[in-house]
C-alpha cells in the first residue's frame, strides 16, 4: 500500500484532495480483505471494485460493517478504465493474464502484483516500498515474505557490509 502512496507522491501526476480509485482482483482472500480495510480507512483512496469469483454479488463486509458495495464478477469482458490503481491479490500463475489485460486497457493505472508472476520481469519494478522512495513506471512487483524480511533486516547495516551477503530461510508452512 505504501508503494501506491510513494508512487503518487513522486509521480508527475499531481496529488490533490481527490480520492484515487483502487480496484482489487482477489478481494475475498486474506490479503484482499486486509487491503479493503486499508483502502476503506484511507482518506485519499476509494475502493472502486473488489473482484472475487467465489463470492461475486455478495455484500462486502469488513469487521461486521457493510461497505455498501458488492464483490464484482471478473471475466474477459471486465474493463479497467477508471481506476488509478489495480492490486492483483491473486495466487501465483494467475496474475499475469490480468496484468496484460489491464495494461492494454489503462496504460496510466498503477498495477501492483502481490504474486510471484512478475518478480523477475524486467518491465516490472521489484520493490520493498519502505526502502524505495521513487518508482519509475507503473508496474510494481511486490517481494515475497522472505525477501521482504531479509531486505528490511539488512537495510540499516547495508553500508557497513563488505562482500556478499547470504540468507537462508526455512518455513514449516508454505
Please report, for each region that a protein language model flagged, where it lies by residue.
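N-terminal Rossmann-like NAD(P) cofactor-binding subdomain of oxidoreductases
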Residues: 2-174
Amino acid at each position: 500500500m505504501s508503494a501506491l502512496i510513494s508512487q503518487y507522491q513522486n509521480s508527475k501526476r499531481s496529488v490533490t484532495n481527490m480520492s484515487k480509485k483502487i480496484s482489487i482482483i482477489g478481494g475475498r482472500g486474506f490479503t484482499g480483505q486486509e487491503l479493503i480495510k486499508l483502502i476503506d480507512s484511507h482518506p485519499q483512496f476509494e475502493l472502486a471494485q473488489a473482484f472475487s469469483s467465489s463470492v461475486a454479488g455478495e455484500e462486502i463486509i469488513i469487521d461486521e460493517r457493510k461497505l455498501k458495495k458488492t464483490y464484482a464478477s471478473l471475466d474477459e469482458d471486465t474493463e479497467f478504465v477508471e481506476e488509478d490503481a489495480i492490486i492483483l491479490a491473486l495466487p501465483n500463475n494467475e496474475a499475469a493474464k490480468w496484468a496484460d489485460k489491464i495494461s492494454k486497457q489503462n496504460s496510466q493505472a498503477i498495477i501492483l502484483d502481490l504474486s510471484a508472476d512478475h518478480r523477475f520481469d524486467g518491465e516490472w519494478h521489484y520493490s520493498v516500498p519502505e526502502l524505495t522512495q521513487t518508482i519509475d513506471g507503473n508496474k510494481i512487483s511486490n517481494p515475497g515474505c522472505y525477501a521482504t524480511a531479509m531486505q528490511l533486516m539488512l537495510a540499516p547495516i547495508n553500508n557497513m557490509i563488505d562482500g556478499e551477503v547470504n540468507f537462508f530461510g526455512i518455513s514449516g508452512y508454505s
